[in-house]
Amino acid sequence: HRFVLRRPTAQVQIGLAYPDVGPEDPGFYAARLALEVLSGGMSSRLFTEVREKRGLVYAVSAFPAGVKGQGLLMAYAGTTKERAGETLEVLRAEVERLAEGVTEEELSRAKVGLKTALVMADESIRSRAASMARDLYMLGRVRSLSEIEAAIEGTSLEAVNAFLRAHPYRDPWVGLLGEVEDV
């Protein structure tokens, strides 16, 4: 699944979309914690491997998306046309390496990251309203902040790794924008 839009741009934009679970799925918090390991800040796998170790990009991220009944894991990187092929390869490899599991240390950082983001989002009326509206649409009810925090904290390393083994991220839709050839 590949879409290429060739345009004269300063950078090549790379987007990946992997099927994922939505908030109604029992594995939702395991998936969100795995995503936080992948892209939750400067100690995340994407930041460390794609930006710090290899210097392929300035910006790289992954985030949840989707509609009712179908979640998505989206990944993004912006790079030069000369490095687009390698960047795409490394970005895919890091997402797909999640199937090997995460460590206790990574999970601990991910839990802190998600709970911190939850607290920060609660500080914004707009963010909380959007979260409540999304919950109503996706779940038919609004989750309390304490419910979300308890679900994050209650998700074990075994649960995350079992989820990742059962739901490996493979065969993404790939979108490329820029001056790309044979990527």
Where are the model-predicted features located?
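Short, flexible turn/loop "capping" segments at secondary-structure junctions
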Residues: 7-10, 65-71, 141, 167-168
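A structural supersecondary motif
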Residues: 15-19, 38-79
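C-terminal regions of mature proteins
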Residues: 97, 110, 115-183
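Buried hydrophobic packing residues in well-ordered domains
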Residues: 16, 32-34, 50, 75, ...
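Short, conserved charged micro-motifs
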Residues: 26, 83-87, 182-183
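His/Glu-based metal-binding/catalytic segments typifying zinc-dependent metallopeptidases
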Residues: 1-44
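M16/insulysin-pitrilysin zinc metalloprotease superfamily fold
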Residues: 61, 65-121
